[in-house]
Amino acid sequence: MHNLEVPEKAASLFGAAHYDGNLLILSCLHGVMGKVYADTVCSPQTAAAVIGDFTFFAGRVSHKAVAFRPKESKNDYRILIPQNRAWEEAIEAVYRGKYRKIERFATKKNPRAFDKDKLERIFSDFSRLSQRFEIVEITSQLYGQCLEMPWSRDLVSNYGSFAEFKKQGLGFVILDKGKIVSGASSYAACGDCI
């Protein structure tokens, strides 16, 4: 598999009908974050969009593509997303006995679906619960702390630096006496979306 210098060459393989404007794929295709690998650089027939733990397959099914592990893969596991049943079968064949099938649910992509009042009620309830905890935006120092702990690494690790995170992403953590105990952040960014 070849890293595409011009990721958009594989865009038609990912077709909107299959991935419905998935931000992770768009981020790869637009060259913002992640990478797109393909069977050939000139006229790809098989492609894989790789960002963080996720790999999205598209185009002509290839066992070689399924078995390919990009050098930037950080974990012992990957989340492989098939474009269709044929890709699913290829994943099952390549990783026979070594995979676990799960079903993930997408978040709502409609900005009007966000209930700001509900969030404010939750925040208000949180504030009354304890003076011990503090919700703060991720700073340069907290970015570094997130990278030090395995459970919090994914809060920031898809961004190459704090400057990149600050420019493209958004995130908050909950501190207990100065120690990060929870967090939420953007996994990826593309254009004005996170």
Task: Show where each model-derived region lies.
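A conserved beta-strand-loop-helix scaffold within acyl/acetyltransferase catalytic domains
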Residues: 157-193
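Short amphipathic alpha-helix that is part of the acyltransferase structural core
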Residues: 1-21, 110-161
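A short, sequence-level motif marking secondary-structure junctions
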Residues: 7, 50-54, 188-189
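Conserved beta-hairpin
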Residues: 30-50, 169-184
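Residues that form generic nucleotide/phosphate-binding pockets
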Residues: 12-16, 27-28, 68-71, 90-94, ...
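Acyl-donor-binding surface of acyltransferase catalytic domains
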Residues: 34-35, 40-144
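Short secondary-structure junctions and interdomain/linker hinges
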Residues: 17-21, 32, 98
